[in-house]
Amino acid sequence: MGENSTTGLRGQADVSQFSDAAVEPTLSSPPTGQRQQSLPLFGEETCSISSAPSVGGGGGWPFQRQGSSRLTSRGTSLSSCSDAGSGLGALRQREDSFPEYHGVGLPLGGKYALDGTGLVLAPRVPFIFSHQLPSLTGLDEAGFSDTRKVPSTYQALAARFVHQVHQEAGNGMYPLWSAGVVLRLCLLGALFFVSVGAWLIFEDEQHVECKLNYAEKTLQEGSSRYLLKGISSAHCTREVNELKGEEISVYAEMGHFFQNDAQVLWSRNDRQLAGKIFTDPKDVRECEPLATAVVGNVTKVLHPCGALAWAVFTDKYQFLEGTPEGDNDQVPMKPIPLNQTQAVLLHSWPWQDMYKNPPAEDRAAVLDKVYFWMSPVDNDDGEDMYKTREEARAELLMDRLNYEEAGEMVENGHFIQWMQTAALGTFRKLYGSLEGPLKLPVSAHITVMYDVSSWKGKKAIVLVQKSRLGGRSLFIGIAYLSFGCLLTMLVFYMLWKKWQYRREGEEIRDLRWQTKTRGSKKTK
């Protein structure tokens, strides 16, 4: 391989202070060269020491640093490297096996020694040397070039990792936290968490909810039932006569209804909801068993398909000022406007690319294959006296979902709210907003069409006065307050510990407090 030999070396930055030292080989005619291959460890590169004839013709051992070499007459130069290797013992064992390479260097000031392998012994500077010597190249007895395999002892990966960690720990700088610094940090943390937790709990008091439960059954499938119920301060989380704020949010709450069930969650086709029309039932097989419907003795593809879309929430809410006194039909009450626009229901949510209605001309071209059950126009047969079942259902949806204000068909705000599956069995869907402040009591006119009695479900109307944070903050406030109290206890413990040491005439300097022995006596 040539006249140069390399060996991997890693040292610390302190080793750069060694300049030059003369090296005398023990034999007058060393082999041509020694090649040592060192693999990089942990992604680091290796430095090398090369053996080459010196400028003066002697057998010097110049050092090579990251590709740049400096040759001096019978001298050496040493530099630091950045890769990891094995321990000192393994390299010394290999040196003893090749005496022709062993040289003795002159001591530098009586503190450091340098030998022919490039090993520097420093009492304060730890070194890591590469550990692989796969081959040796030199001249045999006949004078021909010869290469010999050199046995190498590989250390376990875990042992090398631990060795490197020890080397890093021995030369790293670690902060030693004093008791005063930790005490101040804990005190600041306690003040922060206690104050923020108290503020969150106070804000939660400004969050008021008034909940009206109703779960009346409908008379029969597809029919409606009308209710008029009052909402007073007795239905609220705390005693209030007025719900404050610029707007009061109205939510429809469902109980014991699991939208995240696999049979419901995956029963949908997102491409169809985005405006794609499918005429082949095989294209919407994920919606089964609600992928097709028989309309006029013809099997058609449902648009939109799926169990969740077919079971859209259809109860309707209206609000009136005051409460009824006597017969509902004879007591006039002023209605309260309920905002159900898409801007309110779908505030700051990019729904336009996910929910689209197909163009009217595209729907008209495939009416014989696709059943657009949410469209009153596509189900109108042109006869005013008798309406088909499909036409009646579409017109009922148009009224219950408020197509005029909340959008039509798939782009309806109530429908999009319903299609966002909830993670728990009890959930709320935003229904609209009322202008605030709202004086209590108020009346809720409910058109009941969604029957939940078959699975023992629950329904409720919830009026919400939001806090400045927008929702409930009781849990996070309690969590902050608890952690702040824990830090406060730690502060008092450190103060007591510091006071105890001072009474005993000792000085506490760091956190490594030692347990007092039983025989220790307190100083007076």
Swiss-Prot record:
GO biological process, one term: protein localization to plasma membrane
Keyword Transmembrane: yes
A GO CC term attached to the entry: endoplasmic reticulum
Principal location listed in the UniProt entry: membrane
Membrane spanning stretches: 182-202, 474-494
Region of interest called Disordered, as start-end residue ranges on this chain: 1-40, 52-86
Gene deletion effect: Conditional knockout in tachyzoites severely impairs lytic parasite growth in host cells without affecting intracellular replication. Loss of egress from host cells; however, tachyzoite motility and host cell invasion are normal. Guanylate cyclase GC is unstable and, together with UGO, remains trapped along the secretory pathway. Loss of microneme secretion in response to phosphatidic acid or a decrease in vacuolar pH.
Residue ranges annotated as Cytoplasmic topological domain: 1-181, 495-524
Subcellular localization(s) per the UniProt record: Membrane
Origin: domain of life: Eukaryota
InterPro entries: CDC50/LEM3_fam (IPR005045)
Similarity field: Belongs to the CDC50/LEM3 family.
Annotated protein name in UniProt: CDC50-related protein CDC50.1
Species of provenance: Toxoplasma gondii (strain ATCC 50853 / GT1)
Organism lineage string: Eukaryota, Sar, Alveolata, Apicomplexa, Conoidasida
